[in-house]
Amino acid sequence: MAPAASKLRAEAGLGPLPRRALSQYLRLLRLYPVLTKAATSGILSALGNFLAQLIEKKQKKENCSQKLDVSGPLRYAIYGFFFTGPLGHFFYLLMERWIPSEVPLAGIKRLLLDRLLFAPAFLSLFFLVMNFLEGQDTAAFAAKMKSGFWPALRMNWRVWTPVQFININYIPVQFRVLFANLVALFWYAYLASLGK
């Protein structure tokens, strides 16, 4: 029986290493939820920026091993660790308190809260922090906000609204930051594939 079960696990791709990694992640998530989400956000944000750079270089037919901007993934790691993970953790918990699932139309109300309050505030914070991490002055921040905020927010609303509907209504609260980070990883790659 054991060899058959072992073979079935191997065929399903659920070997002992992924199983242990998942078990460890869940344990850390239970013991240190904010730190675990912060670390996960930092790693996935950096990976997303790195992947975006590789895609851009490949599209331009450049050598992918040369001239990678290591400061980009570092900035995204800092932003993910100190902002995305912790803020996402507390926002989703507060959302559960403010709009319990028993409230009529809770899913729609949560989505509106996320899209109309959290998304614009979080996008503004992103522009501010990235501006600071890039060593830019307040004039550069104001220029980025003026030229880039509304287009970025409109694109955010178009792309992330269905994602957040699923996240808020169907993903357990402890996994919402991870789900959003995994989608963001592909979002960065998609933007890079468009040459943005």
Curated annotation (Swiss-Prot):
Entry keyword set? Membrane, Peroxisome, Transmembrane, Transmembrane helix
Pfam families, alphabetized = Mpv17_PMP22
**Chief location of this protein?**
membrane
Q: What name does the UniProt record give this protein?
A: Peroxisomal membrane protein 2
Q: How does it assemble?
A: Interacts with PEX19 and SIVA1.
Tell me which domain of life the UniProt entry assigns to the organism this sequence originates from: Eukaryota
Q: Which family does it belong to?
A: Belongs to the peroxisomal membrane protein PXMP2/4 family.
For the Peroxisomal compartment, the record's topological domain ranges are: 52-76, 137-174
Membrane topology qualifier: Multi-pass membrane protein
Organism encoding this protein? Bos taurus
* This protein's GO CC annotations: cytoplasm; peroxisomal membrane
Q: Which cysteines are joined by disulfide bonds?
A: none
Transmembrane regions:
31-51, 77-97, 116-136, 175-196
Q: Which residues lie on this side of the membrane: Cytoplasmic?
A: 1-30, 98-115
